[in-house]
Design a protein with these regions (language model features):
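Short alpha-helix
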Residues: 240-257, 262
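Conserved beta-strand signature within the Rossmann-like core of class I S-adenosyl-L-methionine
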Residues: 218-225
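Conserved class I S-adenosyl-L-methionine
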Residues: 109-120
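Class I SAM-dependent methyltransferase SAM/SAH-binding core
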Residues: 120-178
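A short acidic, Gly/Pro-enriched loop at the edge of an enzyme's catalytic core
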Residues: 177-189
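Core SAM-dependent methyltransferase catalytic element
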Residues: 258-277
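Class I SAM-dependent methyltransferase Rossmann-like catalytic core
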Residues: 28-47, 57-106
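A short glycine-rich, Lys/Arg-flanked "PGG" loop and its adjoining helix->strand segment in the class I
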Residues: 204-217
Length: 277
């Protein structure tokens, strides 16, 4: 059983099951769940900038004063770029890398896709847009003992309800990483942002084994994730250190699937596609 979670009141509005959230809502939620990291980084800038500015004024040291001003400008510039980067990932431009991922996997037509996630249905909506004839079976796979290593995960889960607005999107819940879908019933499975939160050493391996089970012969596995690189570091800050590295995803997928392909989107998202053996 997962550890019980105490109800938290959020000031960001929750989604409504019968209405699809807008890209603006998803971008706003990404900013909201990142608020702790933004505040943590801000405190570092203030801890250096305020004393530096005070020294410059009190001791009439122009260099120290202007250094504090420059630090503030750098901080604001980084914040602006981070907000812009989050918009490109979670706002309207996000559909571009999902479309590219689907093309990388040569997926089209009346296919059945399992969207495997940790509590956000954004990926299911985007897949339904890019694949207008597809049926999307969206499965909440979060079933981790204890607290998440990232508090943002629970915020994400609290704010979005399983959708009922699209008849081509059907929501399910996994049971300890066992998927409630029949063997060889899907043409593709898709893993998206947040997959790195599923622990290795058992849980992640089981989930990908389940993905193999539900795939038809020759079925496709698709994955898009944040990378551990300078671009993502500027957008997310030091929290990006806990994501799975691109080379580790590549090795993990090649151990389980054939013909693994990789591409990098302009939104700093790593894209992978492979084929069931």
């Amino acid at each position: 059983m997962t550890k019980s979670h105490e109800a938290v009141t959020h000031w960001y509005p929750a989604s409504v099951a019968a209405k699809r959230p807008t890209p603006w809502w998803y971008w706003g939620r990404a900013v909201y769940v990142s608020r702790r990291d933004y505040w943590k980084i801000t405190k570092y800038f203030l801890a250096v900038g305020i004393p530096l500015g005070a020294i410059g004024v009190m001791f009439r040291l122009p260099l120290a004063f202007w250094a504090s001003v420059a630090l503030a400008e750098i901080g604001l510039l980084l914040l602006a770029y981070s907000l812009f980067g989050l918009y490109r990932m979670y706002g309207h431009p996000g559909a571009r890398y999902v479309r590219r991922l689907v093309e990388l996997g040569s997926l089209k037509g009346k296919v059945t896709v399992a969207d495997l996630h940790i509590g956000t249905y954004r990926h299911a909506f985007l897949l339904s847009d890019v694949l207008p004839e597809a049926t999307i079976q969206t499965v909440d796979c979060w079933n981790v003992e204890g607290e998440s290593p990232e508090e943002a995960v629970q915020d994400v889960r609290d704010l979005e309800a399983p959708p009922t607005s699209n008849p081509r999107i059907v929501a399910y819940k996994a049971d300890h990483f066992t998927l409630p879908l029949p063997d060889a019933s899907c043409d593709a499975v898709c893993f998206g942002f947040g997959t790195h939160e599923i622990p290795t050493g058992g849980a992640r391996e089981k989930l990908f084994s389940e993905a193999n089970r539900i795939l038809r012969p020759g079925g496709k596995v698709l994955l898009f994730e944040h990378g551990w690189d300078a671009h993502n570091y500027v957008i997310f800050g030091p929290v990006i250190h806990h994501v799975t590295k691109r080379q580790d995803w590549d090795k993990f997928l090649r151990e389980r699937f054939d013909d693994v392909k990789y591409a990098r989107s302009t939104q700093a998202v790593d894209l992978f596609a492979g084929t069931r053996r």
